[in-house]
Each structure stands twice: as C-alpha cells, then as structure tokens.
Amino acid sequence: MKHTLNLATALAVGLMPIAAGAQSMSPMRGEVNSFTDAFAVRVFPANPYGQKIKVEIHVYDQNFQPVDAKISPNVFQLGSQASRPVLVVVPFGGAAERKVRICTESIPFPNQQTQIKAQICGKFFGHRKS
C-alpha cells in the first residue's frame, strides 16, 4: 500500500508541469480608442510546449461569428517556448463601438499521435472617436 501511494504521489508531481503549461496569449482583454474606421490590437501568442506548434489567429464577434479583420500573420509556426507579436486590425463596420474576441488556435500537425485543437480567446472593445 505504501509503495502504491508513493508511486501515485510521484506520478502526480511529475505530471504537474505538463498540466501547468498551457497555450497562452497576452493581453487577454483590452479597450482601444480609434479616430479611424478600424482599431488595432497587438497580441502575443505563446507556445509553452516542448515542440513547435502551428498557430492560426481568428477574430469573432460576441456570438463567435467570424469578423472580416486583417491579421498579420494569421497562420504561422511557433517554436518551443516562443512567443511572437500579431497585429489585428478590426473594422468598425459603421458602428461607434465593437466588441470582438481574438482567438489563438493551435492546429495539430498531420500524422502526430495527439490531434487536439486548442483555442484561447481574449475580449477586446473598440471605441470610435469622432
């Protein structure tokens, strides 16, 4: 029994760094004032994993419907323990305000054992000033 408990404890401690390291993006929320027909946000997707991942950036409205935003770059590979800036330009579409979700999605590489698609989204609020 004591041996089983020690083994379970060792496994739990050994797996903690795996569970703690999760795909991330910063910032996760923000408000932007703009004097033009669009507002811009710079986000930083990060890869905490030990191998590279393929990343796609998408922009959605509050109901998770796609928004026609300009994203540069929108698809890229992110190395292990790396982060990179991504510029997102969101049109107001004639409105004075716009709430969007900017999402980082990791895409599994083909022929790999794990085929999980992870998504993390931040909330951003644009205000058009006149």
Name what the model sees in each region.
Residues 1-8:
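Bacterial N-terminal signal peptides that target proteins for export
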Residues 17-19:
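N-terminal signal peptide c-region/cleavage motif recognized by signal peptidases
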Residues 22-25:
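Boundary of Sec targeting at the N-terminus
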Residues 35-42, 97-101:
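Short, solvent-exposed loop/turn segments enriched in Ser/Thr/Gly
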Residues 40-48, 89:
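Short edge beta-strand/loop segments characteristic of extracellular beta-sandwich folds
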Residues 48-66, 106:
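Short acidic, flexible loop segments centered on an aromatic residue
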Residues 65-97:
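Intrinsically disordered, low-complexity Pro/Gly/Ser/Thr-rich segments with frequent PxxP/GP/PP motifs
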Residues 92-130:
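Terminal connector regions
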